[in-house]
């Protein structure tokens, strides 16, 4: 029996073949006690895994919290991508100004991603892929099996953006970061992902609203 097969059982009776003589005492080792034992074991295993593999999202927020955003060069402001076409294509309204305001920082965020990747703190494409997967799941909860998915996305684009923000925020809820650093960091990641077309839909030429 493999470890995966053993893990599928509701208790630990078959999980400890080397300790069967001890655990044969049904008065001491009840089904509930085995379940508690299994739960503690799994929690410890997850905790160790997280310690070995810290969250790329947390590493990014930590780096952003130490980033100076006051020294944006005029050349950076002039060369920044204008997301107006995509904002209009997706009918973004309440988050329109936020994205326009934060777009100027994309160059700094991209450089930060590259630096963190060189340090081995994150893998940029994996981080962005995770954000895209969050978007895909949230989009699915709105679109369901509709054949007119784009129209539904347009009707709910601001709610979808807010839901992605909330999910990223939720993943950092138990961290030691300041509230302000989490909000700023998640907004920067969100806007960068929007510009990279990891969130909401990429405009298609000749597709009129």
Explain the meaning of each model-derived region.
Residues 1-12, 22-42:
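Histidine-centered nuclease catalytic patch
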Residues 9, 29, 34, 50, ...:
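Phenylalanine-focused residue identity feature
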Residues 15:
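The −1 position to Zn-ligating cysteines in a subset of zinc-ribbon hairpins
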Residues 18:
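Short, cysteine/histidine-rich loop/knuckle motifs that typically chelate Zn2+
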Residues 33-80:
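Glycine- and acidic-residue-rich phosphate-binding/metal-coordinating active-site segment common to enzymes
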Residues 60-209:
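Long, low-complexity, intrinsically disordered terminal regions
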């Amino acid at each position: 029996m493999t470890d995966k097969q053993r893990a599928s059982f509701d208790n630990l009776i078959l999980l400890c073949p080397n300790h069967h003589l001890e655990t044969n005492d049904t008065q001491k080792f009840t089904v509930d006690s085995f379940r508690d034992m299994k739960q503690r074991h799994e929690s410890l295993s997850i905790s160790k895994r997280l310690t070995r593999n810290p969250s790329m999202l947390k590493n990014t927020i930590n780096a952003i919290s130490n980033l100076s955003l006051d020294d944006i060069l005029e050349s950076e402001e002039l060369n920044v991508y204008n997301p107006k076409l995509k904002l209009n294509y997706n009918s973004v309204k309440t988050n329109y100004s936020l994205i326009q305001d934060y777009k100027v920082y994309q160059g700094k965020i991209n450089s930060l991603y590259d630096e963190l990747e060189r340090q081995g703190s994150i893998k940029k494409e994996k981080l962005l892929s995770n954000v895209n997967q969050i978007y895909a799941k949230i989009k699915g909860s709105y679109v369901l099996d509709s054949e007119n998915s784009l129209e539904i996305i347009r009707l709910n684009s601001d709610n979808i953006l807010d839901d992605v923000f909330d999910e990223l925020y939720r993943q950092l809820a138990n961290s030691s970061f300041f509230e302000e650093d989490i909000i700023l960091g998640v907004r920067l990641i969100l806007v960068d992902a929007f510009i990279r077309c990891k969130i909401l839909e990429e405009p298609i030429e000749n597709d009129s609203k």
